[in-house]
Amino acid sequence: MRSEPEALPDEVVQLLAPFFPGYDLARVRTIEGIPFYVFGNPVGYADRDRIYFEAGAYRLDTPEGLALLAHEVTHCRQYHRHGTWRFRARYLWSYFHGRLNGMSGKEAYLNIPYEIEAREVEARVYLTMKRLQEN
């Protein structure tokens, strides 16, 4: 069962804004529950300006939770930057290109340029939030 879409809390928008210059984080909505059509058992899934999280995964009180959110927000920004259908086509093309070149499903996924960018942002947010937590 999915929850109703919710806006990001203002304090989260303020924390993440420096990582997403020029992107309006107020447009993002979060929803608990992954859509039935999504395969691979992801913890999070972005579709345009909506982010779906596995139940219990949306934890804004931890560096890990904020980093996961940043990963998915990166995909929202990619949708916005490239357009829905272009983003989806390039994402899937990259995945299938990897598979056709002998990569495992996981390797192909990890080598999708959009995923590489999202993991880079995720890592930066995690390190920043961890430092803030320690101070």
Question: Could you say what each language-model-derived stretch is?
Answer:
Residues T62-Q78:
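Short alpha-helix carrying the canonical HExxH Zn2+-binding catalytic motif
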Residues R2-I34, V38-R48, D61, G83-N135:
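Metalloprotease/metallohydrolase-associated module, dominated by Zn2+-dependent proteases
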Residues D49-A55:
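Short, aliphatic-rich beta-strand segments
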Residues I31, E54, Y79:
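Conserved residues at the C-terminal ends of beta-strands
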Residues Y58-R59, C76, H80, T84:
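Amphipathic alpha-helical interaction segments
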